């Protein structure tokens, strides 16, 4: 059964929430320098997971971990790090961090 590391999840969520342009909520617009910094920070945090990392032409990041049974189809999860202006602290980030925790 999956064991959630609450400290790791909190660290990632708090760390990502710090990349904001506003004091109210979280503002990290897509493709902004702050968005790119948040993405780089997150990739630094997951280096020890030994994932295959690929970025496409528009900046989407794909993290892959090979399964123990390669004949089975892959499981995929998608989310985003950017936010709307004054967005919620967990908008998008929860999906990213949740998927990482499942790995």
Language-model region placement:
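Residue-level preference for alpha-helix termini and adjacent loops
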Residues: 3, 28-30, 80-83, 89
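N-terminal capping segment at the start of a domain
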Residues: 3-33
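Alpha-helical metal-binding/catalytic segments enriched in His/Glu/Asp
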Residues: 77, 87-103
